[in-house]
């Protein structure tokens, strides 16, 4: 008799920030991302918010690994506060792992994290799960989605992504790999849905780059640019 696959959202649904989710099958748990959320104007005295990991703390011995999709704060920012409590291995692409190492050091985390760098296309066996990282296009290099092979079927976690055929950095989202999975059959798709309620599509980053080039070229004085990571 087949077991039960549980999807446990710990943050990030219906909100921007605190992205964190767990998948459980039998005695095995994997965790995807661990982000923070910045407070709104009504949350006086709060510097940031992190997910409630009570579910995981009760089952910390069952956690086989934590998978990080990319290096934005809403996906890695809570790790300095949660990882010492969970003490589990962390898997991420190279740039994401480097950003996470800096984050952990700056926040004063004691001890050496069990941090593993994973290449896209590489598969990681974690208990009942086998996870493959695949490239997606996002506003930061080395962004990835996850193909999670479970005893009940394939779960695809998109990570944060956009469809951009002419990205300025990194490669486009690997639609051919997703097409292959579609042909095999996918049990569940967990997809980024930011601004999905709006009609139309998001233009390429190249269009934005061309506009910025024109603005900067026409500026008569010093140009200051504010960016985020």
Residue ranges of each PLM-predicted region?
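His/Asp/Glu-rich metal-coordinating catalytic cores
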Residues: 2-67, 72-227
């Amino acid at each position: 008799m087949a077991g039960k696959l549980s999807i446990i959202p710990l943050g990030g649904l219906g909100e921007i920030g605190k992205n964190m989710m767990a998948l459980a099958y039998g005695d095995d748990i994997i965790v995807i991302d661990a982000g923070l959320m910045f407070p709104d104007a009504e949350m006086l005295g709060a510097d940031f918010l992190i997910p409630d990991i009570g579910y995981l703390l009760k089952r910390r011995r069952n956690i086989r690994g934590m998978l990080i999709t990319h290096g934005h704060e809403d996906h890695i920012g809570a790790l300095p506060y949660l990882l010492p409590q969970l003490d589990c291995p962390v898997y991420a692409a190279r740039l994401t792992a480097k950003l996470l190492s800096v984050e952990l050091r700056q926040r004063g985390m004691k001890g050496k994290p069990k941090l593993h760098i994973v290449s896209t296309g590489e598969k990681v066996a974690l208990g009942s799960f086998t996870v493959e990282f695949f490239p997606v296009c996002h506003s930061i290099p080395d962004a990835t989605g996850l193909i999670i092979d479970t005893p009940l079927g394939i779960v695809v976690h998109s990570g944060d992504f956009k469809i951009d055929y002419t990205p300025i950095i990194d490669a486009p989202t690997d639609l051919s790999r997703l097409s292959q999975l579609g042909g095999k059959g996918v049990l569940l798709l967990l997809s980024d849905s930011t601004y999905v309620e709006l009609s139309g599509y998001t233009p390429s980053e190249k269009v934005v780059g061309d506009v910025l080039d024109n603005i900067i070229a026409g500026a008569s004085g010093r140009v200051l640019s504010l960016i985020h990571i």
